[in-house]
Amino acid sequence: MTVESVNPETRAPAAPGAPELREPPVAGGGVPLLGHGWRLARDPLAFMSQLRDHGDVVRIKLGPKTVYAVTNPELTGALALNPDYHIAGPLWESLEGLLGKEGVATANGPLHRRQRRTIQPAFRLDAIPAYGPIMEEEAHALTERWQPGKTVDATSESFRVAVRVAARCLLRGQYMDERAERLCVALATVFRGMYRRMVVPLGPLYRLPLPANRRFNDALADLHLLVDEIIAERRASGQKPDDLLTALLEAKDDNGDPIGEQEIHDQVVAILTPGSETIASTIMWLLQALADHPEHADRIRDEVEAVTGGRPVAFEDVRKLRHTGNVIVEAMRLRPAVWVLTRRAVAESELGGYRIPAGADIIYSPYAIQRDPKSYDDNLEFDPDRWLPERAANVPKYAMKPFSAGKRKCPSDHFSMAQLTLITAALATKYRFEQVAGSNDAVRVGITLRPHDLLVRPVAR
């Protein structure tokens, strides 16, 4: 199967007598009104993982809407690379209240291409070393703030460091702890509410003055107020540092006019919130991995000491820390922050021999794809060595794409891996970790995956 085989514009006409495209099978277990939404809400990870038993493409019902679920990694790669599938669908509709319609995360077509041109220079591989000193400082500040033997709330600490790195590197802002805490609290509420709105799309109910709806609306309003404060402070300062916020404030549209205020706002939201949320979630799962797999924490410590000779780990060491990187990738495989993605078919097309009608919403789960036993031996085992070159070559191409692929690939992939590597190396070098009584590392499903309430104790090495 090739990418071209799912592109209706490049697909060769069917030969006379060729079989007609099939309709995908329908998953069982739907109920009136809610369809499969109740199963997706009750146990979403199990539901999405079980769909692979029904075929490569499966029809499900979310409320009254038919949605096409894709379970085959090669077909998810085709979705990512094919321009006939746009960013749209239940996930993105649920995120519009946060991300807006004019940011790079939700835009399509010419607008998306122009926005990528604006932000991409900040994330080029040759631009990342300029952020190195900030990443180093934040990684080591994190280890200094924690005290041996004292319980650490992994949720708040992970989110705080993720927001600080993003703000200091990309916005050059001094909006640190107080705003990071506001962002952390508000995002937890907003992402939970948006997930409910995605899987059970009962719009009128979410407008009722119920306590959960009020909490959601208050948190969303505070997020947007926070972004407006950041933009206003930069303008009032008269400063123009070489950062992403300056690039946005000076960006032009296709007519050569300054971009609108709403687009600037939506772009800053896209910089601060989804990126910080996904990085923070990954740090939480890395802390769990360091606590639950001390042998790999020890290997990271040994690797760092071999590379640095005992000095503090630095940005210049990142590319040499191979096992550290493999631990990060394996943590992302088993617990991807972004566990579900959606697309919309612009035109009628063929996917894996099935007909996808124009306008159809398509959903797939990186969580399910990355745990598929057809792609991975010992698929549920935490095994960073599966990413050694000789073993990684056996993993299907699109069975592990934590930053997506094609034109919708996350632009900050190198930036994200650099900060995750520095933070993991700094933590594992200074401490061993153990979960404490009361810690709950069960998966909490929202727009992203987090532990419910991960509490760890650092133990000095």
Swiss-Prot record:
CDD domains: CYP170A1-like. It comes from the Bacteria. GO terms for cellular component: cytosol. The keyword Transmembrane does not apply. Divalent metal cations. Mg(2+), Ca(2+) or Mn(2+) ions for farnesene synthase activity. Optimum pH is between 7 and 8.2 for monooxygenase activity and between 5.5 and 6.5 for farnesene synthase activity. Its EC number is 1.14.15.39, 4.2.3.47. GO terms for molecular function: heme binding; iron ion binding; monooxygenase activity; oxidoreductase activity, acting on paired donors, with incorporation or reduction of molecular oxygen; sesquiterpene synthase activity; terpene synthase activity. Gene3D superfamilies: Cytochrome P450 (1.10.630.10). Disulfide bonds: none annotated. Heme binds at residue 410. InterPro entries: Cyt_P450, Cyt_P450_E_grp-I, Cyt_P450_sf, Cytochrome_P450_Monoox. SUPFAM superfamilies: Cytochrome P450 (SSF48264). Involved in the biosynthesis of the sesquiterpenoid antibiotic albaflavenone. Catalyzes the two-step allylic oxidation of epi-isozizaene to albaflavenone. First carries out a non-stereo-specific oxidation of epi-isozizaene to give a mixture of the albaflavenol epimers ((5R)-albaflavenol and (5S)-albaflavenol), each of which can serve as substrate for the second oxidation to yield albaflavenone. This is quite different from most other P450s which catalyze regio- and stereospecific oxidation. In addition, displays a farnesene synthase activity with farnesyl diphosphate (FPP) as substrate. Homodimer. Both enzymatic and structural data demonstrate that CYP170A1 is a rare bifunctional enzyme having two distinct active sites within a traditional P450 polypeptide chain that individually catalyze two apparently unrelated biochemical reactions. Belongs to the cytochrome P450 family. This is Bifunctional albaflavenone monooxygenase/terpene synthase. It comes from Streptomyces coelicolor (strain ATCC BAA-471 / A3(2) / M145). The lineage of its organism: Bacteria, Bacillati, Actinomycetota, Actinomycetes, Kitasatosporales.
